Amino acid sequence: MMQSSISSGEAVVRLSRPQVMVAACKSRFRVLVAGRRTGKSFLCRFILYQKARQNPATVCWYVAPTYRMARQIMWKELKEHVPTHEIQKKDETDLRIELVNGSIIALRGADNPDSLRGVGLDLAVLDEVQDIDPDTWLAVLRPALADRMGRALFCGTPKGFNWFY
């Protein structure tokens, strides 16, 4: 497997060639379909942090099928990935990190779509998207990206013929 090294703050992050292709893609809406244990969540974390770090005052969300899954999949690793000196505030209850540049990275669950309303987003990363109700994307998250021309990354694993197929 070919790997590339990319700077992520102070650390150098090693991404595989497919991960680099997804991270570097300029499309507004990106889709990553890959098997289990292929580094999808690692890539999600990298993309969230890069967007927030490089673009002051942006709002970036990581959305998993449930709030509990968001915490289990991403929270510990995200806190370890973001350098301490770049963190203005960390909210363990709301699963939210505010960077010194004013950007916000927050983890959310798609199991309560009404709790996702009312916020404009610059980036939405939907992980395990095959298990998220398509109406949550269409009626809630997609409109949240509209006024800011926000981007989205859909990541998931094949799971039959569903909206992610």
Question: Which ranges hold each PLM region?
Answer:
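Phosphate/NTP-binding elements of NTP-utilizing enzymes
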Residues: 1-165
